[in-house]
Amino acid sequence: MDAAAMESLILELHAIEAVKFGAFVLKSGITSPIYLDLRMLVAHPRLLSTVASLLGSLPATRPYDLLCGVPYTALPIASVLSAAASVPMLLRRYHVTPHAAAECLDGSFRAGDAVLIVEDLVTTGSSVLETVAPLREVGLVVADAVVVIDREQGGRENLAANGVALHSLMTLTEVLAVLVKRGKLGEEKAQEVKRFLDANRKMAVPGLPVKPKVVRKAFSERAGLATNPMGRKLFELMEAKQSNLCVAADVGTATELLDLADKIGPEICMLKTHVDILSDFTPDFGHKLRSIAERHSFLIFEDRKFADIGNTVTMQYEGGIFRILDWADIVNAHIVSGPGIVEGLKLKGLPKGRGLLLLSEMSSAGNLAHGDYTAAAVKIAEQHSDIVIGFISVNPASWSVTPSSPAFIHATPGVQLVAGGDSLGQQYNTPYSVINDRGSDIIIVGRGIIRANNPAETAREYRIQGWHAYQSSLS
């Protein structure tokens, strides 16, 4: 918007009393000498249309698929923009119960869709972030917000800290300058407002602490740091397929598992199995699964959770009816029995180029894998980096002791599009939260995909969301 158009718009907003001066208590709790009331736009359809059109012309950092207006004043603006630009719109209900993000949204969307937030005013940015949260909870990507007026009181900075770029038609400073220039505002009152702005330039969002963003090296770069060939292969495969999705194939029969693997194979980097729950297991199961894995380029992770002494686990790994060593690229282990378990698995796995994940944390409520246990897992991993490729973890960003090398990968179970839990104590987090807030690399999804009506399509949605979260964590 050029200077002349902005000046004309400011004068029109002043004429309809959308800009007022006095003493007003804002949502943030502070008293302001100026009040901006853009609700008045609904009484002036031509001006409403102009504002919507101008907002639509603001450049976003990425193309968007949907619009979402912040309740309530911005809703008519977003509606007009949606109709004019033929961009579908989502409605966010204002009151929503915890872990019910999907229920607070009306409209049609898919995980991975990009949403442009539409707002009338931004002070601290809290209202925008309250709308961003449920959108991200259901797998939508939010990178931009457009606003009519930026009050310049910390909103831009608070939003940027949460991964949202703010684009405004005008700032409050520009509004004051035009009104003084055109004789609509006295210099004394303008100075009072400016002093207020100077004293309140960077306000924190009330009750919404800014989480530090986890920034990581690219998978392609970390591949070169891996000492284990399977760890290197996993990084390279994720980069090539643009997938950091692992599906937990917790089904009851080998027939179901092989069918599922073939359907979702193109979307995943890894398939997690529990071979000992397959009621129809036969010795050729491993060969059949490896054929599917090779066809679709994914790794097989047998979630055996070895926990015994070294001598016993070598026999469990290599022998028995399952012969896990023959077909599983990766296995995992508890460290309760000490480093001997890793040495035993390494004895058999390393000559075959296999990889090992250590259980450093778990996603079930009340588990004991945390604190000193997690620190011990890190120490053992670094002592055996030739076989250990990473960890099963829940919140590696919170660890007091962290691996010295980014070659170790983190895979996190308990991921769904909406946060919450189940009746057996499993705790679920969203892909965005797991990758950006908790610092993991791979999302492990089970019931969210295997119980879906269309597992392949649902896996694609999770893959897109997980990959977008990874990409946003690179800078």
Curated annotation (Swiss-Prot):
It catalyses: orotidine 5'-phosphate + diphosphate = orotate + 5-phospho-alpha-D-ribose 1-diphosphate; orotidine 5'-phosphate + H(+) = UMP + CO2. Pathway: Pyrimidine metabolism; UMP biosynthesis via de novo pathway; UMP from orotate: step 1/2; Pyrimidine metabolism; UMP biosynthesis via de novo pathway; UMP from orotate: step 2/2. It holds the Pfam family OMPdecase. Keywords: Decarboxylase, Glycosyltransferase, Lyase, Multifunctional enzyme, Pyrimidine biosynthesis, Transferase. Gene3D superfamilies: 3.40.50.2020, Aldolase class I (3.20.20.70). The keyword Protease does not apply. SMART domains: OMPdecase. One of its GO terms (molecular function) is orotidine-5'-phosphate decarboxylase activity. The keyword Secreted does not apply. The active site is at residue 305. SUPFAM superfamilies: PRTase-like, Ribulose-phoshate binding barrel. Its EC number is 2.4.2.10, 4.1.1.23. One of its GO terms (biological process) is pyrimidine nucleobase biosynthetic process. PROSITE patterns: OMPDECASE, PUR_PYR_PR_TRANSFER. In the N-terminal section; belongs to the purine/pyrimidine phosphoribosyltransferase family. In the C-terminal section; belongs to the OMP decarboxylase family. This is Uridine 5'-monophosphate synthase. It comes from Oryza sativa subsp. japonica (Rice). The gene is UMPS2.
